C-alpha cells in the first residue's frame, strides 16, 4: 500500500509531517466524489503567502477528518488527475469511508493544534497556555505550609502594631513628679475633735435639774451658772489668807508680764482667773461660801 502512495508523487513525507496537512480543512465526503485534486495547487511558503490567496486555497482544498476510534495506522488516500485510472483500486476504501460518513452531516471543525507560524510569537504563548499554567491558574487551594506562613506573618504584624501603640501611649502620658515630703520639726499631736452637739449634751447634763432641754435655754442657764461659780471663787479667794497670798503673788507676776502691754495695769483677781481659763469646782465645796441670805436648795428645785 505504501508503495502505491509513493508512486503518486503527491503524498510525500513532508506532506504527512506538516501540522496543516491533515487538519487544514474539513469537508464531508460524497458517495461519488472521494478523491482530492491537488494537481493545480502549488504549496508555497506560509510566510510569503498572501491572506487572500491563502483563504482561496484553504476553501478549495478538502481533507477528511478521521474518527477518533480509527487506528493510528489508518491513512487517507489522495489521487491526482493523472492517476484517475487507479480509482478502481480504491473502491474498497471508498465503500468503507461511505459507511463512516453521512452526506447529511454538517461540517465538523476539528480542534486544530497550535500552528507553527504562531510559535515564533511570544504573544500567542499566553493565548495557548500549557497544561502546567492551567493547573496553576485553577488551583485555588494553597498548601498548608503556605497558609501557616501567612498566619504567622499576620500574627507577627499584629503584635508589632500593638507594641507600637503601647509605646505611643506610654510616651504620651506625662511623668508624675515625686512627692517630696518635708519632715516637720513639731511632733504630731492628735487633736480631739468635739462636735457642738456633744458639748450641748454635756451642758444639758449639767443643768438638767432645771428641766430645760432646748438649746437656747440650756446655754443661757449654763452661762449664768458659770458666772455664779466665778463669783464664788473670787469671794473664797478674798476671804482665805492662804489663797490670798497665793493670789497676790500670781497677781504680781501677771502685772509684771502685762506691764509691757497697752492695757489697763490695774488688774483684779477676777481678770486673772479669766486669763487662765474656767475651772469647775464641785458643788459641795461651795456650800460654805455663799452668803447666808441665799438659799442654795432653791437652785435645784
From Swiss-Prot:
<dbReference type="InterPro" id="IPR011598">
    <property type="entry name" value="bHLH_dom"/>
</dbReference>
<keyword id="KW-0804">Transcription</keyword>
<comment type="subunit">
    <text>Homodimer.</text>
</comment>
<protein>
    <recommendedName>
        <fullName>Transcription factor bHLH103</fullName>
    </recommendedName>
</protein>
<dbReference type="GO" id="GO:0003677">
    <property type="term" value="F:DNA binding"/>
</dbReference>
<dbReference type="InterPro" id="IPR045843">
    <property type="entry name" value="IND-like"/>
</dbReference>
<keyword id="KW-0238">DNA-binding</keyword>
<feature type="domain" description="KRAB">
    <location>
        <begin position="29"/>
        <end position="106"/>
    </location>
</feature>
<dbReference type="InterPro" id="IPR045239">
    <property type="entry name" value="bHLH95_bHLH"/>
</dbReference>
<feature type="domain" description="bHLH">
    <location>
        <begin position="180"/>
        <end position="229"/>
    </location>
</feature>
<feature type="compositionally biased region" description="Polar residues">
    <location>
        <begin position="239"/>
        <end position="269"/>
    </location>
</feature>
<keyword id="KW-0539">Nucleus</keyword>
<dbReference type="InterPro" id="IPR036638">
    <property type="entry name" value="HLH_DNA-bd_sf"/>
</dbReference>
<dbReference type="GO" id="GO:0005634">
    <property type="term" value="C:nucleus"/>
</dbReference>
<feature type="region of interest" description="Disordered">
    <location>
        <begin position="161"/>
        <end position="184"/>
    </location>
</feature>
<dbReference type="GO" id="GO:0046983">
    <property type="term" value="F:protein dimerization activity"/>
</dbReference>
<dbReference type="GO" id="GO:0003700">
    <property type="term" value="F:DNA-binding transcription factor activity"/>
</dbReference>
<feature type="region of interest" description="Disordered">
    <location>
        <begin position="239"/>
        <end position="272"/>
    </location>
</feature>
<keyword id="KW-0805">Transcription regulation</keyword>
Amino acid at each position: 500500500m505504501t508503495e502505491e502512495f509513493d508512486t503518486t508523487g503527491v503524498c510525500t513525507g513532508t506532506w504527512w509531517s506538516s501540522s496543516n496537512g491533515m487538519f487544514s480543512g474539513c469537508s464531508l465526503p460524497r458517495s461519488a466524489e472521494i478523491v482530492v485534486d491537488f494537481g493545480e495547487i502549488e504549496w508555497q511558503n506560509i510566510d510569503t503567502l498572501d491572506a487572500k490567496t491563502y483563504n482561496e486555497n484553504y476553501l478549495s482544498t478538502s481533507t477528511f477528518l478521521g474518527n477518533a476510534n480509527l487506528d493510528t495506522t489508518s491513512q487517507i488516500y489522495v489521487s491526482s488527475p493523472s492517476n484517475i485510472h487507479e480509482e478502481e483500486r480504491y473502491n474498497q476504501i471508498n465503500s468503507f469511508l461511505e459507511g463512516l460518513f453521512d452526506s447529511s452531516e454538517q461540517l465538523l471543525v476539528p480542534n486544530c493544534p497550535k500552528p507553527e507560524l504562531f510559535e515564533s510569537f511570544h504573544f500567542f504563548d499566553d493565548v495557548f497556555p500549557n497544561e502546567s499554567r492551567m493547573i496553576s491558574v485553577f488551583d485555588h487551594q494553597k498548601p498548608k505550609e503556605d497558609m501557616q506562613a501567612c498566619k504567622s506573618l499576620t500574627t507577627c504584624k499584629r503584635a508589632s502594631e500593638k507594641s507600637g501603640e503601647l509605646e505611643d501611649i506610654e510616651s504620651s502620658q506625662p511623668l508624675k513628679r515625686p512627692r517630696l515630703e518635708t519632715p516637720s520639726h513639731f511632733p504630731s499631736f492628735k487633736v480631739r475633735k468635739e462636735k457642738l452637739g456633744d458639748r450641748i449634751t454635756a451642758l444639758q447634763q449639767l443643768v438638767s435639774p432645771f428641766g430645760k432641754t432646748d438649746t437656747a435655754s440650756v446655754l443661757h442657764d449654763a452661762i449664768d451658772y458659770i458666772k455664779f461659780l466665778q463669783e464664788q471663787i473670787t469671794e473664797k479667794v478674798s476671804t482665805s489668807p492662804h489663797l490670798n497670798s497665793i493670789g497676790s503673788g500670781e497677781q504680781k507676776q501677771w502685772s509684771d508680764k502685762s506691764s509691757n502691754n497697752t492695757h489697763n495695769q490695774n488688774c483684779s483677781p477676777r481678770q486673772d482667773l479669766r486669763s487662765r481659763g474656767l475651772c469647775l469646782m464641785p458643788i459641795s465645796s461651795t456650800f460654805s461660801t455663799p452668803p447666808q441670805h441665799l438659799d442654795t436648795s432653791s437652785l435645784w428645785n
